Amino acid sequence: MKIIYPEELKQKLIKKLNYFYILLGEDSILLSKAEQLIFYFAKDKKFIEKNTINIEKSTDWNKVINFHKSKNLFFKKTILIINFTIKKLNLSLVKNINKIPLFKNKDILTVIKLNALSSLIKKSTILKILILESEIIYCSTPYEWAFKKWLQYEIKTRNLKITQESFLLLHKYYEGNTLCLNQILDILSITWPNENIKIEKIKKIINQFSIFSPVNWINAIFNKNKKKAIYILDSFFKQKYNPLILIRTLQKDLLILLNMKREKKLNINFFLKKNNISLNRSKFFANALYYIDFNNFLKIIRILLQIEIKIKKEYNNSVWIQLKTLTLLLSSPMKYTP
């Protein structure tokens, strides 16, 4: 399976526009950017019309068949977007999907969004016929080297002049948060379009426009990145974010972590998939499983309960002090020895 990464897509489209594209992953920013690029180059080839078919159940595939049957003399060049919201594939649907290349037509450009099915496709050959005929674009949230390459590409695309120190700061605080970083880069390009952007300017923008999710906070904790975890928590405090959402999200992930610890033979990816956790987070759970002192779990659960009671009875800023204590406790590198 040959994968096209987001930073490679534009050059691929310049060379050749294919008739089949598979968008593999669930990152909303990467999906949106990939679609926009495909649409832009398709428009140049006179693909003006768009038709979206959502596959929510296996019988919805009939809509795809009917679309192809409806082609007539007055048919205009169309981009067909097949959007899978279904969570599982049955044999009948697999057979039908693999037949898509048989419908190959110079007037139809097909974009397949696999969404939640992406992890299944990466590890299986069930759609091998479709994969052989398609360009596969990787749209999962990038981390580490992949995030670095994507960030470099986005900076270059906007013609931003950013110092190495500034680049490293953006990478440090926004790794895995494409939504927030995309917005920050847009702000930088509007604010300082032709200037050399030094770290002081980056810090100023970061302090003014910080958009994080509870998952970003938990990932930083599980990755032993105390400084980043506290920074994200402070951002939530400034935004007057509902701390109960943070508590519930953390409780859920800690429970999953505890159940992972109890497994005698653990397949992390399978376990996370079963619990509806993105496989992109597997490294964070693996890290936490390795270093968190599970003897502290009772203490952690006790603090969580205290915070929840305080939120419901007499909410005040001391809740955030307790959340900070909890963050430091969880992100301390205490290797667990079984």
From Swiss-Prot:
Name the GO cellular-component terms.
DNA polymerase III complex
- Is Transferase a UniProt keyword of this protein? yes
Which Pfam families does this entry report, sorted A to Z?
Answer: DNA_pol3_delt_C, DNA_pol3_delta
GO terms classed as biological process = DNA-templated DNA replication
Give the EC number(s) listed in the UniProt record. Answer: 2.7.7.7
Keyword annotations from UniProtKB, A to Z: DNA replication, DNA-directed DNA polymerase, Nucleotidyltransferase, Transferase
Superkingdom of the source species? Bacteria
InterPro entries per the UniProt record, alphabetical: DNA_pol3_clamp-load_cplx_C, DNA_pol3_delt_C, DNA_pol3_delta_N, DNA_polIII_delta, P-loop_NTPase
- EC class: transferase
Please write the reaction equations for the catalytic activity of this protein: DNA(n) + a 2'-deoxyribonucleoside 5'-triphosphate = DNA(n+1) + diphosphate
| An MF annotation (GO) of this entry | DNA binding
Family membership: Belongs to the DNA polymerase HolA subunit family.
**Subunit composition?**
DNA polymerase III contains a core (composed of alpha, epsilon and theta chains) that associates with a tau subunit. This core dimerizes to form the POLIII' complex. PolIII' associates with the gamma complex (composed of gamma, delta, delta', psi and chi chains) and with the beta chain to form the complete DNA polymerase III complex.
Q: What does this protein do?
A: DNA polymerase III is a complex, multichain enzyme responsible for most of the replicative synthesis in bacteria. This DNA polymerase also exhibits 3' to 5' exonuclease activity. The delta subunit seems to interact with the gamma subunit to transfer the beta subunit on the DNA.
Q: What is this protein called?
A: DNA polymerase III subunit delta
